[in-house]
């Protein structure tokens, strides 16, 4: 029984292990957004954990914006500092961007050495759930919690594979439709060129006959 529990713990730890990203964003007077992209399925819960150094009023203003590839904005937060936790549920299966801008205040415009360090951790689906709360609410044993977590993670992986398969089929259908259109367009162009060439030959023959050249 212990070996099974140990194996489940190792598997669940491996599945849920996500290394936090370490970012260093310099402060500028006209900053460009620095974005991290991830993919999420429809109606999937996402939790974004952010830890930054510095504090409000230190000459830098770190702003955050989370938006997906379809234009849906999930969060916008200005002048973040310290630890910030943001949760949201996706509207569609799409990629989403977590974008930071680090604005340098004007009074420090001559100082180009300001940098805001960020530790970013993004969890989605089963990894984003509070399993301690689930265990307490449903009175589950640790092994049962691990099994539930693995089950949900497996279901999510299966869903992602189904999405990728459906996407590949749509792309294949699009390619086949495009190839068919290109084929018929090529036939039309060739037919038009042949017809134009035949017309030019007839026109030149008529012209030369009228001019008594042939």
UniProtKB/Swiss-Prot annotation:
Location(s) in or outside the cell: Endoplasmic reticulum membrane; Golgi apparatus membrane
Membrane topology of this protein: Single-pass type I membrane protein
Protein family membership: Belongs to the EMP24/GP25L family.
Signal peptide: 1-20
Parts of the chain on the Cytoplasmic side: 205-214
Top-level taxon in the UniProt lineage: Eukaryota
Function comment: Constituent of COPII-coated endoplasmic reticulum-derived transport vesicles. Required for efficient transport of a subset of secretory proteins to the Golgi. Facilitates retrograde transport from the Golgi to the endoplasmic reticulum.
GO biological process terms held by the UniProt record: protein transport; vesicle-mediated transport
InterPro entries per record: Emp24-like (IPR015720), GOLD_dom (IPR009038)
CC annotations in GO: endoplasmic reticulum membrane; Golgi membrane
Transmembrane stretches, start-end: 184-204
PROSITE patterns: GOLD
The organism of origin for this protein: Debaryomyces hansenii (strain ATCC 36239 / CBS 767 / BCRC 21394 / JCM 1990 / NBRC 0083 / IGC 2968)
Protein name: Endoplasmic reticulum vesicle protein 25
Keyword Membrane: yes
Location of the GOLD domain: 33-124
Residue intervals annotated with topology Lumenal: 21-183
Main location: endoplasmic reticulum
Record keywords, A-Z: Endoplasmic reticulum, ER-Golgi transport, Golgi apparatus, Membrane, Protein transport, Signal, Transmembrane, Transmembrane helix, Transport
Pfam families: EMP24_GP25L
């Amino acid at each position: 029984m212990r070996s099974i529990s140990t194996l489940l713990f190792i598997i669940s730890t491996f599945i849920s292990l996500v290394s936090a990203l370490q970012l260093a964003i310099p402060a500028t007077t006209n900053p460009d957004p620095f974005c991290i992209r991830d993919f999420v399925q429809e109606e999937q819960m996402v939790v974004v954990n952010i830890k930054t150094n510095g504090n409000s009023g230190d000459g830098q203003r770190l702003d955050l914006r989370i938006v997906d590839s379809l234009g849906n904005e999930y969060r916008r937060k200005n002048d973040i500092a310290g630890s910030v936790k943001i949760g949201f549920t996706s509207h569609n299966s799409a990629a989403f961007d977590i974008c930071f801008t680090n604005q340098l205040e004007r009074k420090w415009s001559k100082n180009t050495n300001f940098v805001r360090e960020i530790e970013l951790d993004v969890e989605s689906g089963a990894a984003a759930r509070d399993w301690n709360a689930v265990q307490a609410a449903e009175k589950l044993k640790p092994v049962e919690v691990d099994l539930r977590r693995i089950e949900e993670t497996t279901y999510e992986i299966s869903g992602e594979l189904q999405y990728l398969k459906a996407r590949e089929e749509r792309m294949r259908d699009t390619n086949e439709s495009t190839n068919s259109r290109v084929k018929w367009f090529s036939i039309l162009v060739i037919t038009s060129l042949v017809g134009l060439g035949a017309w030019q030959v007839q026109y030149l023959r008529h012209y030369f006959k009228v001019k008594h050249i042939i």
